[in-house]
Amino acid sequence: MKKILTTLIIILAAFTTTTFAQQQKGDVEFGIHVGYGGSNVSSSNLVNSSISSAFNAGIATDFYFSNRWSLKTKLIFDQKGWGSGFLATVDDQFITDFRLNYITLPVMANWHFGKKRNWYLNFGPYVGYLAGAKATDVSTDVKDYFHNTDFGLAAGIGTKIRLSNNLKLLIEYDAQEGFTDIFKENSGSAVRNSRASFNVGFNFILK
């Protein structure tokens, strides 16, 4: 086991110390990623709420204006929601987890830093379309209770490890914080989405 770990460290060090040209103005990267983390909702008067596991997967493009700045857009299948929520029906009341599936489009300014510009920090708005919503413990479709769109702020930090002239390994932490109430009818304080995730993926250099 110790030999395997040593070998992996040597390989990773070789990739990170290899000299490659930095991205320049006009360069474009295309990426794919998967991620896993947690989601919840924020509200001043929500009694029942806990973190729920959340999966996401998506594609991204990164258009460079310089070796420091680029415009990054993503298209993501995004699981959101929360655990230990309250659901009332005509016949009964339940404590259940809520799973909200979104197709999310963040548009972010991407700042590249570090000696090799292999670290990045991005931030910008996102819009999400609600593809489906369920109360999972009782297998009930609850999409009609929620707005079809969600708006908020997306941000992330990560690193890209150059594997070859045209391929990078991506490791990042990203988060989204909603600005709008997700419920169609809500007499109390607004309930907003909140999601954070660790992602891994690959970026392909197109130009």
Task: Map each language-model feature to its residues.
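Transmembrane beta-strands of outer-membrane beta-barrel proteins
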Residues: V28-I32, L71-T73, L105, W119-V127, ...
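Short glycine/proline- and aromatic-enriched beta-strand/turn motifs that initiate or cap beta-hairpins
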Residues: F20-F63, L71, N203-K207
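Residue-level signature of outer-membrane beta-barrel architecture
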Residues: T61-F63, W111-F113, Y129, T159-I161, ...
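Outer-membrane beta-barrel translocator domains and adjoining extracellular loop/strand segments
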Residues: S42-N48, G83-V90, A133-T140, I182-G188
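Transmembrane beta-strands of outer-membrane beta-barrel pores
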Residues: Y36-N40, F77-G81, V127-A131, A175-D181, ...
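Outer-membrane beta-barrel "beta-signal"
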Residues: H33, I161-L163, R192-K207
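Outer-membrane beta-barrel channels and translocator barrels
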Residues: K25, S66, G114-K116, R162-N166, ...
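Residues that define the transmembrane beta-barrel architecture of outer-membrane proteins
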Residues: G26-V28, S49-F55, R99-I103, H147-L153, ...
